């Protein structure tokens, strides 16, 4: 892939790209605070607008960043839908055993801390696949959305497009994992 430099006036990115990344950063934490889902919608709309404007003006770097932002929101939504579909599928596969259903109802009505609920849910016979799928899809949604956002921000700092960031993308992944695993440990 061609490495686009953003040092000349034809390839500089404007403040709207930075605003898009700020919205994506907020959207990355939408599973903790559902109100932040609106930031994803705003980032999507802003990304489409910026992409159209960049295409009109022939600004390749800005176009690449706007496309990266749009793709990040759509990827997050796709991961959420696939995760929910998998959870529904595994839950259907578990069946509707009355004892299991009564235990699930008891857990969902409880006021225990989330980690305790997860431990009790894990103890239900046949629920391990569902717990693994729920935790895995949630972690993938949280980490991958934040990783792409941080990769975009790091690419702005390095003056390249997000896709041509190189080995620094691993730093974005490491930061995303540390943030998304660290926040629940602090909050829970």
Which residues does each predicted region cover?
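Alpha-helical membrane insertion/targeting regions
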Residues: 2-188
């Amino acid at each position: 892939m061609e490495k686009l430099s953003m040092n000349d006036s034809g390839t500089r990115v404007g403040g709207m790209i930075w605003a898009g990344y700020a919205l994506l950063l907020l959207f990355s934490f939408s599973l903790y605070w559902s109100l932040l889902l609106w930031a994803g919608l705003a980032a999507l709309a802003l990304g489409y607008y910026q992409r159209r404007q960049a295409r009109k003006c022939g600004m390749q770097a800005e176009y690449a960043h706007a496309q990266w932002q749009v793709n990040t929101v759509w990827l997050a939504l796709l991961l959420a839908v696939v995760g929910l579909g998998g959870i529904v599928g595994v839950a259907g596969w578990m069946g509707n055993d009355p004892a299991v259903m009564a235990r699930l109802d008891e857990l969902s009505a409880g006021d225990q801390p989330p980690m305790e609920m997860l431990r009790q849910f894990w103890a239900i016979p046949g629920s391990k696949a569902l717990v693994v799928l729920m935790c895995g899809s949630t972690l993938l949604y949280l980490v991958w959305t934040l990783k792409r956002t941080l990769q975009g921000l790091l690419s702005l700092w390095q003056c390249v497009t997000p896709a041509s960031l190189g080995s620094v993308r691993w730093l974005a992944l490491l930061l995303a994992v540390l943030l998304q695993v660290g926040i629940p440990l602090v909050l829970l």
